[in-house]
């Protein structure tokens, strides 16, 4: 079946103007996630911020109670004992100058990047490569840290980084279609709570304006914010 026809069929039974309770919304998208692969369930939150202003930036990290269903590759910039700690914790790639050269050469063999503070002058050279991908280590979200073992285990255990995009939207994967409805709802609420707590000082008016959930190949379903927050 062509993608267009599949999506049209999936939209049947969904009121595109209605705000659904989160449990009902999750059921609707799970029922329509019929691809041969285990589709990712995603959330999109429209925020009342303008990220062009520094005091309206929203960024953070949250460990989802039921994980993401995805195995992240973790890269760590560290030397000596900290490099050994990272390896023991399960980091996929660990290095210093050698890892910088690898990344500069166009090979990024990781999805999450962690660094010890002393490595940041070196890692800073990769700003143009890692920055646009949202992978630059940042102390505010715990990816610049001396506790590299804890950061690696957190990344491997289901932590999700979130960051508001230019249009004022936060998007993130919160699990797989194979997850139970209850686990997906718990993950949605955990992420939404973290975004709510990350409300910047410069935000004015309604902070979380709209919420929608979808699967990788399915239609979006609008969610009643009150069933997610609080």
From Swiss-Prot:
Listed GO MF terms: rRNA binding; structural constituent of ribosome; tRNA binding
Pfam families reported in the protein's UniProt record: Ribosomal_L1
One cellular component (GO) term of this entry: cytosolic large ribosomal subunit
Key words of the record: Repressor, Ribonucleoprotein, Ribosomal protein, RNA-binding, rRNA-binding, Translation regulation, tRNA-binding
InterPro entries: Ribosom_uL1_bac-type, Ribosomal_uL1, Ribosomal_uL1-like, Ribosomal_uL1/biogenesis, Ribosomal_uL1_3-a/b-sand, Ribosomal_uL1_CS
Superkingdom to which the source organism belongs: Bacteria
Any single biological process term in GO: translation
Known role: Binds directly to 23S rRNA. The L1 stalk is quite mobile in the ribosome, and is involved in E site tRNA release. Protein L1 is also a translational repressor protein, it controls the translation of the L11 operon by binding to its mRNA.
UniProt similarity note: Belongs to the universal ribosomal protein uL1 family.
Subunit structure: Part of the 50S ribosomal subunit.
Name of the protein described by the UniProt record: Large ribosomal subunit protein uL1
Organism name: Nitrobacter hamburgensis (strain DSM 10229 / NCIMB 13809 / X14)
